């Protein structure tokens, strides 16, 4: 039997051919990174758009709460020679604080809209989102304080306090109590929306890392 011999031929690549292939191998990670970056930007832009919508909703509820409380006044149809029975929001310092606090919240939400728009245009920007988180948290504290203190007064107006001999005035001033109750509810709605805004901004910052 004859033995067959095989010949091994080594083909040596030139430097020029190696240089021509090297960029092709290096482009894959770059393209993949660009795709991931684009997907992350799209998600953040969606979060920023939702943030803007929630800010508009919070503005509407805060404005409604401020206007409802500031225009609350009721005068009973009967009066005596010396007294006229009237109830107004500025009779109670707590309700006055409520109006001032909600006016500050409304002004802040208007001023925060440009920052929210910047986050839509530049979804990877960190500083605007960080500022929104900080100031949103401060505004949450202010709104919660105003709504909580006013809710206590509204409760007393509806139920009174027998131990302190505080009478429930809502039986006489029904319209007054309805308006202040609606204002307090709108303020708590604003608090809930602001909490969602902080969660959204924190989620967007987490995606950045």
Swiss-Prot record:
Parts of the chain on the Cytoplasmic side: 1-46, 118-129, 201-209
Membrane-related topology note: Multi-pass membrane protein
GO biological process: cell wall modification; cell-cell junction assembly
Self-association state and partner proteins as the record states: Homodimer and heterodimers.
Similarity section: Belongs to the Casparian strip membrane proteins (CASP) family.
Function description: Regulates membrane-cell wall junctions and localized cell wall deposition. Required for establishment of the Casparian strip membrane domain (CSD) and the subsequent formation of Casparian strips, a cell wall modification of the root endodermis that determines an apoplastic barrier between the intraorganismal apoplasm and the extraorganismal apoplasm and prevents lateral diffusion.
Protein name: Casparian strip membrane protein 1
